[in-house]
Amino acid sequence: MSNFEMAGTGSSRNNEEDNQQNTNWVWYKHTNNNLSTSHNNQIWQQPSLDLYPGQIDVCDMTTSSRSLTISCQECGNQAKKGCTHGRCRTCCKSNGLHCPTHVRSTWIPIAKRRERQQQLQTPTSNPTGGSGRVGKYRDINQHATLDSSGLEMGETRFPDEVSSDALFRCVRMSGTDDGEGQYAYQTTVGIAGHLFKGILYNQGPENKSMRSTQFYENPPRS
């Protein structure tokens, strides 16, 4: 019995060694596959580059759609997008580099920016105060002087007051806010050799203190 047990014990040890060898063979085979796979990955994988300030990784631009911030190679500020030298406008100009992206500057001084913001924030009021329309007026760049005889601008002198016959045509103005329209009168007059056109809007009932104006439906034409 003891010999039989010893033989069985020896056979079991041999089986364990065979299993261990088989296990080791399978484990080494799996390791070789990993090595071959990693070797293939190393062949196809592109090496990473050390980027200096102002350089762009071309691989990131083709594979990523996020916006990149480019720094100037000299001062470290934000460089102009599309600059081939990788510098800002000031550094390109100081070094004498001809860059097409730095030809025109989009920088606006802070004084002009504040003035523009104040103009946008200031509402334009209607001088007549009638139907709440916002009038748009063009600034006159030429210097004008006003005296007792009228307004003089350049070589043209405009009278202070004009009394002339004009034809007023009744037109219907459509409203954009409420959809309801109103009636107005359109006229064209010539003063001092210049043509003036305008529209008279309805300002409500006539005030008795105002000087009445006599209108003709069909005024005589010269």
UniProtKB/Swiss-Prot annotation:
The reply to whether Metal-binding figures as a keyword in the UniProt entry is yes
Q: Name one GO cellular component term.
A: nucleus
Alphabetical UniProt keywords:
Activator, Auxin biosynthesis, Auxin signaling pathway, Developmental protein, DNA-binding, Metal-binding, Nucleus, Zinc
Ligand binding (Zn(2+) 1): 72, 75, 83, 88
Ranges annotated as DNA-binding: 72-99
InterPro entries referenced in this protein's UniProt entry, alphabetically: SHI, SHI_C, Znf_LRP1
Compositionally skewed regions (Polar residues) per UniProt: 118-128
What outcome is recorded for mutants in which this gene has been deleted? No visible phenotype.
Q: Which family does it belong to?
A: Belongs to the SHI protein family.
The protein's name is Protein SHI RELATED SEQUENCE 4
Give the originating organism.
Answer: Arabidopsis thaliana
Specify the taxonomic lineage: Eukaryota, Viridiplantae, Streptophyta, Embryophyta, Tracheophyta
